[in-house]
């Protein structure tokens, strides 16, 4: 990609809070003078992309519910081909960083940084791979790809203690937006 790519994903199937974290990270970067764009596959939508999401003309059936939610005041590109989407963002000259929502298992786009988000109440479940468990990839292999881990909510399973000591770990908490 022509600009840095920060991948936000998780090692387990199901919700861990990745999308709200991507929204928060976008807003933090923008408030510091960066011009991020979000790259999403558009799960659940019919658009194959690359398509810039416009809430005024797109709906969840077209671009997916998460990209539509993220596009509220943010630049979001849906592209099933993540590498092509990253090129479109980078070559546009407007954005200086790409936030890839849920792309840890995509081997076609190099990441400058990979952030893993984990649900503190769920951890890694039974620790088994899909279909016997929730893991998308073997645990050691997935953890080796991470540059940073976010535990969303209270670490009820003790998963944080199992993370490598060299991996920076931060605790986060989802709060409803009152605005």
Predicted regions mapped to residue ranges:
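Walker A (P-loop) phosphate-binding motif
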Residues: 1-58
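Phosphate/Mg2+-binding loops and adjacent switch elements
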Residues: 42-167, 178
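ASCE RecA-like P-loop NTPase motor cores
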Residues: 171-173
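Proteins with a high burden of low-complexity, intrinsically disordered sequence enriched in S/T/G/P/A and R
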Residues: 1-5, 11-12, 78, 156-157, ...
């Amino acid at each position: 990609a022509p600009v840095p790519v920060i991948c936000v994903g998780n090692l387990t199937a199901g919700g861990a809070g990745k999308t709200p974290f991507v929204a928060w990270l976008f807003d933090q970067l923008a408030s510091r003078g960066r011009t991020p764009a979000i790259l999403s596959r558009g799960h659940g939508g019919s658009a194959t992309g690359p398509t810039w999401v416009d809430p005024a003309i797109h709906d969840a059936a077209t671009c997916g519910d998460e990209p539509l939610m993220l596009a509220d005041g943010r630049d979001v590109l849906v592209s099933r081909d993540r590498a092509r989407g990253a090129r479109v963002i980078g070559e546009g000259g407007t954005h200086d960083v790409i936030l890839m929502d849920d792309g840890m298992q995509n081997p076609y786009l190099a990441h400058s940084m990979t952030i893993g988000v984990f649900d503190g109440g769920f951890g890694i479940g039974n620790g088994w791979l899909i279909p016997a468990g929730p893991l998308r990839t073997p645990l050691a292999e997935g953890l080796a790809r991470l540059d940073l881990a976010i535990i969303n909510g209270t670490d009820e399973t003790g998963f944080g203690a199992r993370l490598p000591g060299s991996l920076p770990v931060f605790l986060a908490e989802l709060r409803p937006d009152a605005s």
